C-alpha cells in the first residue's frame, strides 16, 4: 500500500476555509513565495504546485493564502503512522506525508484493498483527514496508484492488468521521471509509460545513464525493492543544507557568508551521525532559475565546518562565472566515511592544521550546545545577512540523504 495524507490537514485546522479555494504558500518576504500545496477547489481553477503566488492569484482571484504549519504536519503524520502500525510494522516513510506499507503478512485482516479501505475510514474517523491509497504488487505502482484517484479514494493496480491500466499514462507520472528526464524522453518521442517500457536498454542507458535502465524496470513492473520496517534507519549517504536567500547574492563575499552559515549545520549533523565527509558538492541557482552543480573530493575526510566551507567556496569560485546574481545555494557533504575509519593521508594536506581546526570546531560546537547556537560564531556572520529566518525540518528520504 502507498498512503498519501492529503494537505487537507491544513483545512482540518481551519474549518472556516472548507469549500474555499486554498493554497499553502511560502513566505514572499523570504523568497519562498510559491504554491506548496493546494486543495481541490483551487485545483479546479488551474492552480498548480510550484507556481508563483501572483500566477495563482491570476487564475483564482478569491484564492485564500495560508502559511505552512510544519509542526502540525509532523504531528498528524505521526498520528497517521500510529494507525498504520496497527496493521503492519513494515512502514517506510516517503517524505512528510507519504508512506509505503507492506501488508503481505496481514492476510488475516483481509485483502490489500480491504485493509486499505479500513485504514482510510479509520484515519478519517479518528483524525478527520482524507487519504488516498494505491494498492499494488510493488512500491512504484502503489505510489502511482495513490496519485490516480484523489481525495479519499483507493486505486488497485494488479500484476495481470497493469499494462492496460497504466501504460497509457504520461511517463512523468512514474516515480523517478522528473522534469529533466521527462524533457529528454519527450525529445525522442517517448511520452507514455508504455513507450518507456518498450524502449531499448542501450538507448536509455546512452541518453540517461543507469537511471534510464531503472525507470524502464519500473515501467515494466519489475521493481522488487522491499518495504522497510518502521524501525529501520536508512544509511546516511550524504548530508546537505540549502537555502533560498531573501535577496540575490551579488558577489563572492556574500556567497562565502551563506556557505559558512550552511556548513555549521552540516558539521553538527556529521558529528551526530559519526561521519566524515570525503567530498563536497554544491548547487547554485541563479535568478533566472537555472541550476548548476559541481563536486570534488577532499584530500582527507573531515567534520570541520570551516574546512568544508573553504572547500565549497573554492569549488564555487573556480566554476561560477557571475553571469547572473544567485538566488539559492546548497552545500552537501558526500562520500561519507565512519569517523573512526582508518584514513590514508595524502602528500598535500596540512594534517596538523586540519586536526587543530577540527578540535577547535568541536570545542565551538560544545559551547553552542550548552549556551545556544548564537553564543559563538564567525565574525563575518555578524554582519547583515541575506539569509532568511531559520525554519528547520529534517527529513530522511529513502535515498539516505538528510537535509
Where are these regions (language model features)?
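Short, hydrophobic beta-strand segments
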Residues: 99-105, 293-296, 344-349
Amino acid at each position: 500500500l502507498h498512503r498519501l495524507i492529503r494537505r487537507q490537514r491544513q483545512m482540518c485546522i481551519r474549518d472556516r476555509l472548507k469549500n474555499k479555494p486554498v493554497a499553502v504558500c511560502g513566505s514572499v518576504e523570504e523568497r519562498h513565495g510559491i504554491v506548496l500545496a493546494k486543495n481541490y477547489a483551487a485545483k479546479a481553477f488551474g492552480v498548480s504546485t510550484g507556481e508563483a503566488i501572483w500566477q495563482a492569484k491570476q487564475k483564482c482571484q478569491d484564492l485564500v493564502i495560508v502559511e505552512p504549519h510544519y509542526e502540525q504536519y509532523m504531528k498528524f503524520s505521526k498520528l497517521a503512522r500510529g494507525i498504520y502500525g496497527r496493521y503492519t510494522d513494515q512502514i517506510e516513510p516517503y517524505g512528510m506525508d507519504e508512506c509505503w506499507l507492506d501488508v503481505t503478512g496481514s492476510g488475516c485482516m483481509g485483502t490489500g484493498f480491504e485493509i486499505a479501505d479500513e485504514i482510510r475510514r479509520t484515519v478519517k474517523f479518528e483524525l478527520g483527514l482524507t487519504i488516498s491509497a494505491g494498492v499494488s504488487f510493488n512500491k512504484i505502482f502503489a505510489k502511482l496508484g495513490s496519485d490516480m484517484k484523489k481525495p479519499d479514494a483507493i486505486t488497485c493496480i494488479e500484476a495481470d492488468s497493469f499494462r492496460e491500466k497504466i501504460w497509457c499514462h504520461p511517463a512523468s507520472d512514474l516515480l523517478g521521471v522528473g522534469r529533466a528526464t521527462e524533457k529528454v524522453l519527450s525529445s525522442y518521442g517517448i511520452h507514455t509509460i508504455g513507450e518507456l517500457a518498450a524502449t531499448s536498454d542501450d538507448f536509455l542507458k546512452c541518453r540517461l545513464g543507469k537511471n534510464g535502465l531503472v525507470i524502464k524496470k519500473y515501467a515494466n513492473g519489475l521493481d522488487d525493492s522491499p518495504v522497510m520496517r518502521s524501525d529501520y534507519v536508512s544509511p546516511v549517504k550524504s548530508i546537505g543544507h540549502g537555502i533560498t536567500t531573501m535577496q540575490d547574492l551579488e558577489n563572492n563575499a556574500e556567497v562565502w557568508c551563506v556557505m559558512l552559515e550552511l556548513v555549521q549545520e552540516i558539521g553538527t549533523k556529521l558529528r551526530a551521525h559519526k561521519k566524515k565527509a570525503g567530498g563536497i558538492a554544491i548547487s547554485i541557482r541563479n535568478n533566472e532559475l537555472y541550476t548548476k552543480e559541481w563536486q570534488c573530493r577532499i584530500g582527507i575526510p573531515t567534520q570541520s565546518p570551516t574546512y568544508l566551507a573553504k572547500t565549497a567556496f573554492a569549488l564555487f569560485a573556480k566554476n561560477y562565472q557571475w553571469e547572473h546574481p544567485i538566488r539559492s545555494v546548497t552545500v552537501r557533504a558526500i562520500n561519507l566515511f565512519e569517523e573512526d575509519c582508518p584514513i590514508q593521508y595524502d602528500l598535500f594536506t596540512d594534517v596538523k592544521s586540519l586536526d587543530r581546526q577540527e578540535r577547535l570546531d568541536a570545542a565551538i560546537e560544545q559551547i553552542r550546545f550548552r549556551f545556544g547556537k548564537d553564543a559563538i560564531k564567525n565574525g563575518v556572520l555578524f554582519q547583515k545577512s541575506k539569509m532568511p529566518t531559520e525554519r528547520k525540518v529534517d527529513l530522511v528520504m529513502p535515498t539516505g540523504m538528510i537535509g
